[in-house]
Design a protein with these regions (language model features):
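Rhodanese-like catalytic fold shared by cysteine-dependent sulfurtransferases
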Residues: 1-15, 22-53, 64-121
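Short, surface-exposed ligand- or partner-binding patches at beta-edge/loop junctions that are enriched
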Residues: 57
Length: 121
């Protein structure tokens, strides 16, 4: 699902789940997303509302695909977002860096790039 479609679904009440690692979440995220790292998803899926659609994102697409499949297998209406967080940013949609401030597109890209360079390999 493309980022603009995801935004529309979220506006209509869908849940947005970020399955990236803690350091990625800290660097920047989509405002309003719930952070459920992939390695914690099985134990924390109960935090999600089964009555509302779930859209899952990560950095590039593979983790969110796995998470969406796992959630669908557990009875959720779950869909991965195409292109991950970079596609969201490229679509000009807002990101939220640490501290709760929703950055403009260019600001968020700078934050993400700086964090990516300083992240452990």
């Amino acid at each position: 699902m493309e980022p603009n479609e995801v935004q529309k679904l979220v506006d209509e009440g869908a849940q947005l789940v970020d399955v990236r690692a803690d350091y990625e979440w800290d660097a920047g995220r989509i405002a309003g997303a719930v952070h459920l790292p992939l390695d914690q998803l099985a134990g924390r899926a109960g935090e999600l509302d089964r009555e509302r659609p779930v859209v899952v994102y990560c950095r590039g697409g593979s983790r969110c695909q796995m998470a969406a499949e796992a959630l669908a297998g557990a009875g959720f209406d779950a869909t991965p977002m195409d292109g991950g967080l970079p596609a969201w940013e490229e679509a000009g949609l807002p990101l939220e860096p640490e501290g709760g401030y929703v950055a403009e597109s260019g600001e968020a890209a700078a934050v993400l790039e700086a964090r990516k360079r300083s992240a452990p390999d």
